[in-house]
Structures are given as structure tokens and as C-alpha cells.
Amino acid sequence: MMAKQVVVLLALLLLLPIVTASMGDASGRTGRIYMYGTSIQDLFRYLQLDYQRNVFLLRFLLGRGGLLLH
């Protein structure tokens, strides 16, 4: 159980620079990553999920056919 949480946290740490870099780009060159990054952040904000449910949702999104990479 603990190993899964570590893997999820590592995946989140790897995705954060991509999301933040794309959000800082006003030209729209990284449109796809920007779209997925903001949609996930908005989803967390609107649902007001706690940390464990955020990790579960992130694991779900990453596990379903690589949603973030398409």
C-alpha cells in the first residue's frame, strides 16, 4: 500500500513542472497539456476533495489509458 502511494507521489512530482510550465505559457503552444492540467486542477477545486481522494483520482486518471498523454 505504501509503495503505491510513493509511486503516485513521484508521478505527481514529475507532472507538476509540465503543468506549471504550460500554465505559464501565454502563447498557447502547449495547448493540450494546458487543457488537461487546468481541467484536473479545476476538478480538484470544485469537488473539494481531500488528499487521499486526490491521490485516488490521480491514480485513476493515470491508469486509464494514459489520459494525460493523449
Curated annotation (Swiss-Prot):
Query: Secretion signal: which residues?
Result: 1-21
What are the record's GO terms for cellular component? Answer: extracellular region
Lineage, top ranks: Eukaryota, Metazoa, Spiralia, Lophotrochozoa, Mollusca
Where can this protein be found?
Answer: Secreted
By what name is this protein known?
Turripeptide OL179
Role summary = Acts as a neurotoxin by inhibiting an ion channel.
Expression across tissues is:
Expressed by the venom duct.
Keywords, A to Z, come to: Ion channel impairing toxin, Neurotoxin, Secreted, Signal, Toxin
Task: From the UniProt record, list the residues forming the propeptide.
Answer: 22-32
Organism, per UniProt?
A: Iotyrris olangoensis
Q: Per its record, what are the GO molecular function terms?
A: ion channel regulator activity; toxin activity
Kindly give any further remark recorded in the entry.
The mature peptide does not contain cysteine residues.
